[in-house]
Amino acid sequence: MTTRRIIACLDVKDGKVVKGVRFLDLKLKGDPAELASRYEEEGADEIVFLDISATVEGRKTLLEKVRETASVLSIPLTVGGGVRTVEDVSNLLSNGADKVSLNTVAAENPSVVSMASREFGAQAVVVAIDAKRVGNGWRVFVRSGTKDTGLDAVDWAKRVEEMGAGEILLTSIDRDGTRDGYDLELTKAVVRATKVPVIASGGAGKPDHFLSVFRQAGADAALAAGIFHDGVIRIRELKDYLKDAGIEVRT
């Protein structure tokens, strides 16, 4: 049986963790290193650190904050935001990231994905796909959800796998921060189209949502932010719930 992972996400702006709804209306939640440490203690399997304003502001990821966060963790840390080159990937890995998430750059300069995968291994390369429902399908949006690439999300997932992505971080923009549940249809479509692990993101609001995205959509991991920041769900209790429901989790 596949062991499912619970991942806590830190959306970082100006060095502080924030959270909004559908990528808008951001509210301050705390310090990245402090929250990361707390989530590891609570039983998170991994931490994702996303510098959400780096690309839009045309700057690189805040390496100092990455180092601080990595220094308090013994679980894997994925870092994204503001990555434009293979050198940026290298800098993040040498400053404490275990994996690097590529989002906008993957769509605008796909060769970075394949080059990073060759140089550092697929296990270090995560491609983040921010998808929004358009018509009967889903389209890929970049630059913090502000730019429609015209790419079909499921087709794009297949392509990034071929380019060397070792994992896909799939976020439903429609569900982000709503706490209405993950987009099961979107997640299932990407899981079926690819062989690499898929992390479901966007919409977690209660334990049942995690169960559904694992059992019905087949996600390998489920990511959440706001419900953990606000104490709506404790990770340890969530894992107990999933285990009781027959889902294999690390305890």
Curated annotation (Swiss-Prot):
Pathway(s) annotated for this protein in UniProt: Amino-acid biosynthesis; L-histidine biosynthesis; L-histidine from 5-phospho-alpha-D-ribose 1-diphosphate: step 5/9
Which residues are named in the active-site annotation?
D11, D130
Q: Which UniProt keywords apply?
A: Amino-acid biosynthesis, Cytoplasm, Histidine biosynthesis, Lyase
Question: InterPro entries recorded for this chain?
Answer: Aldolase_TIM, His_biosynth, HisF, IGPS_HisA/HisF, RibuloseP-bd_barrel
Q: Where is the signal peptide?
A: none
Keyword check for Cytoplasm, yes or no. yes
Describe the reaction catalysed, as an equation: 5-[(5-phospho-1-deoxy-D-ribulos-1-ylimino)methylamino]-1-(5-phospho-beta-D-ribosyl)imidazole-4-carboxamide + L-glutamine = D-erythro-1-(imidazol-4-yl)glycerol 3-phosphate + 5-amino-1-(5-phospho-beta-D-ribosyl)imidazole-4-carboxamide + L-glutamate + H(+)
Q: Does the keyword Cytoplasm apply?
A: yes
One Pfam family, short name please? His_biosynth
- Location relative to the cell: Cytoplasm
Q: Name one GO molecular function term.
A: imidazoleglycerol-phosphate synthase activity
A cellular component annotation (GO) from this entry: cytoplasm
Enzyme class (EC, first level): lyase
Biological process terms from the Gene Ontology for this record are: L-histidine biosynthetic process
- The enzyme's E.C. designation: 4.3.2.10
* Subunit structure of this chain's protein: Heterodimer of HisH and HisF.
PANTHER family, alphabetized: IMIDAZOLE GLYCEROL PHOSPHATE SYNTHASE HISHF (PTHR21235:SF2), IMIDAZOLE GLYCEROL PHOSPHATE SYNTHASE SUBUNIT HISF/H IGP SYNTHASE SUBUNIT HISF/H (PTHR21235)
Give the family, as the similarity comment puts it: Belongs to the HisA/HisF family.
The UniProt function text for this chain reads: IGPS catalyzes the conversion of PRFAR and glutamine to IGP, AICAR and glutamate. The HisF subunit catalyzes the cyclization activity that produces IGP and AICAR from PRFAR using the ammonia provided by the HisH subunit.
Name used for this protein in its record: Imidazole glycerol phosphate synthase subunit HisF
Q: What is the source species?
A: Metallosphaera sedula (strain ATCC 51363 / DSM 5348 / JCM 9185 / NBRC 15509 / TH2)
Q: Which gene encodes it?
A: hisF
